[in-house]
Amino acid sequence: MLQFVRAGARAWLRPTGSQGLSSLAEEAARATENPEQVASEGLPEPVLRKVELPVPTHRRPVQAWVESLRGFEQERVGLADLHPDVFATAPRLDILHQVAMWQKNFKRISYAKTKTRAEVRGGGRKPWPQKGTGRARHGSIRSPLWRGGGVAHGPRGPTSYYYMLPMKVRALGLKVALTVKLAQDDLHIMDSLELPTGDPQYLTELAHYRRWGDSVLLVDLTHEEMPQSIVEATSRLKTFNLIPAVGLNVHSMLKHQTLVLTLPTVAFLEDKLLWQDSRYRPLYPFSLPYSDFPRPLPHATQGPAATPYHC
């Protein structure tokens, strides 16, 4: 009985207009269940981008802030949902090492070359007779045993260190690099790379204000969609590099301290990287990195009965 009296007194003493934690939680739950009602009431929608590709049922999209480069104070303009299979994978450092070493060596060519005893000038005459002198027997002064002679088992360049990693390993390396950058708060998503001015000093001061570090890699969808202001600003800065989305690689992400992506770039990366998980195994070598469909037969005719692709 005493408990009921105390509960009634607390309810009577509560000021008008105040809400308990339970009621606030119920309102937040109703807002998440009915986002259309929240939008109809005039409240801004915080999520600017939704994941277009299907997400596994046991996982949820990862959220990141969407920022803007148009001002120092416009640091956060909304949220973006990121696919967990691209931006929240297991941090496989061994995969990062494999892909980084592959990028370092697959274009490496060593031009080191030494001459054998047949290529060294001279040495055609036997230095002394085989017997009778008491010296060790030799047949040429250009033997590898002699000073100035040829080299045995030396490098015979040019030597190529080319090898190819499986495409799915390379795609996994990009996923791991994006995941690590996001986990370390070194990945920033922008609504656009548009700057109010093309002065490089503005970009350096903005990066210093937001604590991006000394080196920044900015990625846009294509060269044609890059704003002229960001092109002018990065062209005069050595540590700020601007590349298209198709050129994003593990080496560049590890080399730069901060990675900046646009919303169209995020959609492009999710589409291309998740396609590697579900594509069929090719029976022919790829002609392009992202074209897996065979080309039409040269003798195929136009019409419904024509076979457009190889079987």
Curated annotation (Swiss-Prot):
Which GO molecular-function terms appear in the entry? RNA binding; structural constituent of ribosome
Database matches in InterPro entries: Ribosomal_uL4, Ribosomal_uL4-like, Ribosomal_uL4_dom_sf
Residues annotated with Omega-N-methylarginine modification: 147
One cellular component GO annotation, for this chain's record? mitochondrial large ribosomal subunit
Q: Where is this region: Disordered?
A: 118-149
What keywords is this UniProt entry annotated with? Methylation, Mitochondrion, Ribonucleoprotein, Ribosomal protein
Tell me the compartments it is located in.
Answer: Mitochondrion
Query: What GO biological process terms are annotated to this protein in UniProt?
Result: mitochondrial translation
Mainly resides where?
mitochondrion
In which domain of life is the source organism classified?
A: Eukaryota
Per UniProt, subunit arrangement is:
Component of the mitochondrial large ribosomal subunit (mt-LSU). Mature mammalian 55S mitochondrial ribosomes consist of a small (28S) and a large (39S) subunit. The 28S small subunit contains a 12S ribosomal RNA (12S mt-rRNA) and 30 different proteins. The 39S large subunit contains a 16S rRNA (16S mt-rRNA), a copy of mitochondrial valine transfer RNA (mt-tRNA(Val)), which plays an integral structural role, and 52 different proteins. Interacts with MIEF1 upstream open reading frame protein.
Q: Which protein family is it in?
A: Belongs to the universal ribosomal protein uL4 family.
Q: What is this protein called?
A: Large ribosomal subunit protein uL4m
Q: Which gene encodes it?
A: MRPL4
